[in-house]
């Protein structure tokens, strides 16, 4: 081999080391990167497809729709959570408690829509953005000796708001009007039982902790809820946590239901959190991992039952 030829060869090899090899590595790295992206994208869409096809699971609505409806000349507001799809779906009317600003109940909305239920949170008169006077202010205006009776009177009047909410829900194209449940916590549990006296065509009643905070001090309320259980027009599942303010609602109303041979179940769960309020409102609104499967099983049974 000629010396100049060898020299040229070494120079060419140096050029290849400087340019050709890095260029090849860059191309190779890009090919690997794009293959990786395609693989990840395929896995994502396959996972999304499997999730969409899974039985009993729906894509949860990220935000509810704020709606307006009327009750007794008052403009009431509420929040409507809907599963993905056209429906018609079974639905739940959720009765909030005594809080001034009930909100949209996002934990419950997500839970129920993921299981293919429309979830409606109507705000009764004087609460949230709804017109009217706040029930707690009206109770406080009564003489102390009359407050227990006054609270029951006001609760009875607010049943009209729940019925208006139910009628609004039945009018929605996404809702199956023959598969509606009424539920709620605390004051909302009271509303659930009082509304359940009416023959409104609902499939079930699921009261959480009805009157538990005021039970011991309010004999008129005790008597009224006993009567509501006697007159109930739908099966009842009453739920409380062991550290609620009082477990008397479960015990007294269960005894009455058994005596009258009503379609009634009650369940007391282990303590939730550390305080009475944790076991009361916290349990109702955020412990879906504790009571959720039991409620869904109860609702499924009632949805299948013939009226």
What are these regions (language model features)?
Residues 140-172:
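Alpha/beta-hydrolase active-site loop
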């Amino acid at each position: 081999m000629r010396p100049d030829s060898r020299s040229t060869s070494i120079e060419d090899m140096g050029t290849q080391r400087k340019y050709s090899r890095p260029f090849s590595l860059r191309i190779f790295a890009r090919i690997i990167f794009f293959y990786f992206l395609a693989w990840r994208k395929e896995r994502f869409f396959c996972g999304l497809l499997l999730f969409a096809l899974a039985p009993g699971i729906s894509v949860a609505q990220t935000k509810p729709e704020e709606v307006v409806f009327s009750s007794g000349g008052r403009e009431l507001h509420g929040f409507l959570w809907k599963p993905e799809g056209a429906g018609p779906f079974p639905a739940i009317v959720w009765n909030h408690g005594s809080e001034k600003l009930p909100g949209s109940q996002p934990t419950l909305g997500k839970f129920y829509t993921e299981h293919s239920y429309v979830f409606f949170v109507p705000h009764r008169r004087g609460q949230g953005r709804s017109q009217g006077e706040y029930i707690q202010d009206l109770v406080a205006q009564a003489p102390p000796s009359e407050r227990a009776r006054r609270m029951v009177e006001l609760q009875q009047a607010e049943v009209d708001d729940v019925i208006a909410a139910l009628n609004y829900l039945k009018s929605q194209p996404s809702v199956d009007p023959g598969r509606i449940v009424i539920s709620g916590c605390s004051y909302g549990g009271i509303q659930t039982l009082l509304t359940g006296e009416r023959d409104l065509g609902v499939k079930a009643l699921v009261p959480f902790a009805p009157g538990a905070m005021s039970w011991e001090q309010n004999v008129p309320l005790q008597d009224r809820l006993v009567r509501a259980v006697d007159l109930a027009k739908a099966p009842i599942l009453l739920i409380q946590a062991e550290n609620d303010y009082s477990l008397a609602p479960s015990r007294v109303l269960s005894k009455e239901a058994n005596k009258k041979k009503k379609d009634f179940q009650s369940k007391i769960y282990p303590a939730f959190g550390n305080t009475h309020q944790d076991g009361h409102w916290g349990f109702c609104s955020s412990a879906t991992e504790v009571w959720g499967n039991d409620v869904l099983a109860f609702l499924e049974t009632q949805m299948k039952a013939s009226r």
